[in-house]
Amino acid sequence: MTATSLWELAERARKRLSEIAKGNRDRALLAMADLLEARWEEVLRANREDLEEAERTGLPKAKLDRLALKEKDLKTLTEGLRQIARLPDPLGRIEGLAKRPNGLRVGRMRVPLGLIGFIYEARPGATVEAVSVALKAGNAMLLRGGKEAFRSNRALVALWHEALEEAGLPEEAVTLVPTTDREAVLEMCRLELLDLLIPRGGEELIRLVQQEARVPVLAHAKGVNHLYVDEKADLSMALRLALNGKTQRPAVCNALEAVLVHEKVAEAFLPRLEKAMREKGVELRACPRALPLLKEAVPAREDEWDREYLDLVLRVKVVSGLEEALAHIARYGSRHTEAICTEDPKAAWRFLEEVDASLVLWNASTRFNDGFELGLGAEIGISTSKLHAYGPMGPLELTTLKWVALGEGQERT
């Protein structure tokens, strides 16, 4: 695909932005939910073709897991669409309206960001979730999905076009870059017609987009997520949280990658953790202080403490207390998701206040860092950068504020 043809796709989308913002966006979301329920088998058929080719080419297991659509995904996606449709319209409301001494009323109005470029790896569910969030906020989307999911994405975008037509909205609101050529990623990075670029995938993709982009970038980076088991933790609860965080779905960004255990409870907790993880097929990699308490763990290398496994592998470290846990997270964490298990409110609140992450949890699984679970309906990604948005990005995070002033003929003196 040439840079010129990509420019033309983006230009057509930009020309329809005002129609998208003013149109019946909720109707399009509800229509898409209905179409998914009626035509899910078509989507699964395209997804099976993608999976067969990916398996032939040796795609890693973690990526195959993200590529695969399952029957249960239908319920998650349709519930998310309908939940977003029920959310208040984020556009048009004026915030902070205040009257100046001269009678001029000033405030800030919520408006769409505009045309968003979304570059993402082999995760077709994001073609539904990301578009639904962007559309609710009145934005148009230019999509470049991973080549492994091309058939799945094409089938889903075709349904989006039907939903948009049913709602009286232009199909340019959702445009799929019609090529698997990696050069299209670089062309999107150079496309100055975009108002924002959102990359969602591995470190290599994120770094490439950040280096090459000529427009603002909101990065969805890796999740090096920790659970700190405090000396006053309920150890049965801590075990459940560790199992849920690591084994429910290990190949996602909010999965648990490391457990930090207070030295006073390590002897009681670590053998239980090893037994439970072994039953789930999880390999433990441990620090020197933890190794004597574990029968089958292997030593953790120094260069892997900041690694995102996306697999059934878990790091374990014994720490002297909260201070060391905080220091470890500050050094190795990725500002994604961090959790503490404790019955001590003082320790919990210090953890909540001092840990720098997009979601910090007390006595809950890291798996809750998700737009649907946090009441956003869905998300376009989880931002680990602080400018504009931090954490799951729902419709509100895909708007911006412009100043408006309501006058009665005031002139500046």
From Swiss-Prot:
At the top of the EC hierarchy, this enzyme's class is oxidoreductase
Q: Which Gene3D superfamilies match?
A: Aldehyde Dehydrogenase, Chain A, domain 1, Aldehyde Dehydrogenase, Chain A, domain 2
Q: Which UniProt keywords apply?
A: Amino-acid biosynthesis, Cytoplasm, NADP, Oxidoreductase, Proline biosynthesis
- Where does the record say this protein resides? Cytoplasm
Q: In which pathway does it act?
A: Amino-acid biosynthesis; L-proline biosynthesis; L-glutamate 5-semialdehyde from L-glutamate: step 2/2
Q: Which CDD domains match?
A: ALDH_F18-19_ProA-GPR (cd07079)
The protein in question is named Gamma-glutamyl phosphate reductase
Q: What organism does the record attribute this protein to?
A: Thermus thermophilus (strain ATCC BAA-163 / DSM 7039 / HB27)
